[in-house]
Regions:
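Dinucleotide-binding/catalytic capping subdomain of oxidoreductase cores
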Residues: 2-34, 133, 152, 159-163, ...
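Feature captures the FAD/FMN-dependent oxidoreductase FAD-binding
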Residues: 5-70, 163, 170-181
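Glycine/Thr-rich phosphate-binding loops of Rossmann-like dinucleotide-binding domains
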Residues: 39, 81-83, 119, 124, ...
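Core beta-strand elements of the Rossmann-like FAD/NAD(P) dinucleotide-binding domain
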Residues: 58-70, 188-197, 261
């Protein structure tokens, strides 16, 4: 009865768990004879990779070059944001930023009713946060069976989550009283909701462009993939094309074996 959560300890446990997992993987790599370098890799011609070190090496070197018969590109992904006014405001978060908060939000509006959005809705509503989901499509978890979607919607509503489907976000603005206001359209009616924070959970984008961009020339994305612009994508696509690799909307095209258009160069990941 009246159970509360020490959110600080929850975050400490999360960080400790992540650190243990990362350390464990690093030890496995080392035990299997894998050399690990910390830095930014850039693919060059003739199956060569330039590595710009995160910190200078013991000899003072800031970069090095490596040649290989086979190269695997695994750039991962980063949280996407909608091209909507107000997305840049303080308090509008992605999944990366939400768990960086030091305390449980009093209220949270989640843009997106996909897997990521629903997961965070369940977690933060259980922690005592007032959660609202705005989903543009007619139902939650649009890629899943209708029955699953309906059951999850009922479960979330019983837990106090407000759900608005068919809700198209128009803009986000600062609330004079504090927090943020999301303006959206639902059933042809203009609506708005205020909350302490807004989570943009509309999927993820491929993080491949940086593999083809010189980190010194495009320093703004070396530490922040979300800073990618059309200019970056076009430059990356052109460089990739020159290497025999095709990119489409940031994705690297491969054949059924995961090989790109350049012999010996493969791409993996989601």
């Amino acid at each position: 009865e009246k159970v509360t959560v020490n959110y600080g300890e929850v975050l400490d446990y999360k960080h400790e768990t992540i650190d243990k997992l990362v350390s464990g993987v690093e030890q496995l790599l080392k035990a299997n004879g894998v050399t690990m370098l910390k830095g930014t890799g850039t693919l060059l011609a003739d199956r060569q990779v330039k590595v710009t070190f995160a910190e200078p090496a013991e000899d003072g070197a800031t970069e090095s070059y490596y040649d290989a018969e086979h190269i695997i590109l695994a750039g991962g992904s980063y949280p996407a944001k909608l091209p909507v006014e107000g997305m840049e405001l303080e308090g509008v978060l992605t999944s990366d930023g939400l768990f960086a908060l030091k305390e449980i939000p009093e209220s949270l509006t989640i843009i997106g009713g996909g897997v990521i959005g629903v997961e965070f809705a369940e977690v933060f509503s259980a922690l005592g946060c007032k959660v609202t989901i705005l989903e543009a499509l007619p139902k939650l978890l649009a890629n899943l069976d209708k029955e699953i979607s309906q059951n999850l919607k009922m479960i979330l509503k019983k837990r106090g989550v407000d759900i608005h489907t068919g809700a198209s976000l128009a803009k986000i603005e600062k609330d004079p009283a504090g927090g943020l206001i999301c303006h959206y359209t639902e059933k042809d009616k203009d609506q708005s909701i205020s909350s302490q924070y807004v989570l943009c959970a509309v999927g993820r984008k491929p993080n491949a462009a940086g593999l083809f961009l010189d980190p010194e020339e495009f320093a703004d994305i070396a530490e922040n993939s979300a800073a990618l612009t059309t200019k970056h994508l076009e430059a990356a696509a052109q460089t990739a094309h020159d290497l025999g690799i095709t990119m489409e909307r940031g994705f690297i095209e491969t054949d059924i074996y995961g090989q790109t258009g350049a012999p010996g160069i493969y791409a993996i990941g989601d």
